């Protein structure tokens, strides 16, 4: 069958042989939940951490490239126990793994999760919003003890995107690919993305106070 498909995967669920077969079967893109390779942070939030160190992540990324599969990766900032210095280590993880596209999200302690309960008990940090409408990974709804203000955490997410996407090596690689494919739509999309990165307009700003929908944890 002539199929083109994509999927999500964890780095400890694939190997070189599986990725080769996936590529041969039409898989063109895998979204990996890398999150972080900083052990000090991963142990606080990730339960299944076997074979999830930085070297494993880099190896899986290389196997994916060899199989002709595009790599998208998710990375987190604002993790329990995080400081700005540790967040920068996670950002460096992303650069070392070097996926085709990286998504940086703020940890969001959704109601009912173990993390939300622990924060409510005074562990890890404090909530800064109880508005259910604000609970997504693009908004800062809680503040780890390692940060001084919500703005500092929001700025860290902005820094992550700029640090990853505005690298000369990354820009040149994307330009080379666009020239090779001749995809004008892709070129326009990348230009708009670059402008948004410089302006910081790709993030949802911290909301002003308004009537909120209170959450019970």
Segments and roles (model prediction):
Residues 165-172, 183, 187, 199, ...:
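Residue-level signal for secondary-structure boundary elements
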Residues 189-217:
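Short linear elements at protein peripheries
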Residues 1-182, 215-217:
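A structural motif corresponding to the C-terminal lobe/cap of the Radical SAM core domain
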């Amino acid at each position: 069958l002539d199929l083109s498909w994509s999927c999500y995967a964890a780095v400890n669920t694939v190997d070189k042989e599986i990725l080769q077969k996936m590529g041969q079967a039409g898989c063109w893109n895998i979204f990996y939940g890398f999150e972080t390779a900083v052990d000090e942070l991963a142990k606080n939030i990730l339960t299944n951490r076997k074979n999830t160190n930085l070297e494993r992540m880099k190896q899986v990324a290389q196997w994916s490239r060899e199989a002709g599969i595009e790599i998208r990766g998710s990375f987190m900032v604002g993790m329990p126990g995080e400081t700005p210095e540790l967040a920068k280590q996670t950002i460096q993880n992303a650069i070392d793994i070097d996926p085709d596209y990286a998504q940086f999200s703020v940890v969001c302690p959704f109601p009912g999760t173990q993390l939300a309960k622990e924060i409510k008990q005074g562990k890890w940090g404090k909530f800064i919003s109880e508005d259910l409408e604000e609970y997504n990974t693009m908004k800062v709804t809680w503040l780890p003890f390692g940060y001084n203000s919500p703005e500092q955490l929001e700025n860290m997410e902005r820094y992550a995107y700029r640090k990853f996407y505005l690298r000369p090596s990354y820009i040149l690689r994307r330009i080379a690919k666009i020239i090779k494919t001749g995809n004008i739509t892709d070129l326009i999309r990348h230009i708009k993305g670059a402008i948004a990165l410089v302006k910081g307009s790709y993030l949802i700003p911290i909301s002003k106070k308004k009537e909120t929908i209170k959450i019970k944890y």
